[in-house]
């Protein structure tokens, strides 16, 4: 979900030769990004108001080069794990529109979502290209990671760190969703007890 569209606008400014589409269900949030893109006369940015589950209805097979997931709701409760935008349920949707070797970026302030995404990567044979548990502590930061969103500035998770992971999907994700859910019940419950 693109939220206020800061990432779409930022990437559009950095890469005027590429097209960017921000997707979110809430039109009032996207309006801010759309207005900013119009004000800056950025013709390579569009916004689509829809649910993420509907992506394959709007994009064809192999149509998307990259997907940026920036500061999504981490859905902290184990019972809501299937709503995490890096859950295999969503990764299978992304496979339908991503080009072969296309990449997915996750930038978050949630250590919980970052750990979950790494767990999913390990379990499902996903190729992690880059992973960082403190973006701004790096000596060199890729310019695409310097774009700040409204939600990043709020640091909702209170972690004072920004986590990043970039990965590409295999041709097929194994059917391990039940196994993942059972593992989450054990590990996330243990982490909650430890964190108290």
Model-derived regions, located:
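Conserved SAM/SAH-binding beta-strand->alpha-helix loop
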Residues: 26
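A short acidic, Gly/Pro-enriched loop at the edge of an enzyme's catalytic core
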Residues: 57-66, 71
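A short glycine-rich, Lys/Arg-flanked "PGG" loop and its adjoining helix->strand segment in the class I
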Residues: 86-100
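SAM/dcSAM-binding transferase cores
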Residues: 129-196
């Amino acid at each position: 979900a693109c939220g206020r569209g800061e990432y779409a606008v930022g990437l559009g400014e950095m890469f005027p030769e590429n097209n960017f589409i921000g997707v979110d269900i809430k039109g009032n949030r996207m309006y801010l990004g759309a207005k900013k893109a119009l004000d800056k006369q950025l013709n390579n940015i569009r916004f689509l108001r829809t649910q993420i589950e509907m992506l394959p209805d709007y994009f064809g097979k192999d149509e998307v080069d990259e997907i940026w997931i920036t500061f999504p709701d981490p859905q902290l409760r184990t019972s809501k794990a299937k709503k995490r935008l890096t859950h295999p349920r969503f990764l299978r949707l992304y496979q339908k529109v991503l080009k072969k070797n296309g990449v997915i970026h996750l930038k978050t302030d949630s250590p919980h979502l970052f750990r979950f995404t790494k767990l999913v990567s390990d379990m499902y044979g996903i190729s992690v290209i880059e992973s960082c548990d403190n973006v701004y502590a790096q000596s060199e930061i890729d310019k695409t990671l310097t774009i700040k969103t409204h939600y990043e500035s709020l640091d909702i998770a209170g972690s004072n760190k920004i986590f990043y992971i970039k990965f590409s999907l295999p041709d097929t994700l194994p059917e391990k969703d039940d196994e993942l859910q059972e593992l989450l019940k054990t590990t996330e419950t243990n982490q909650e007890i430890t964190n108290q």
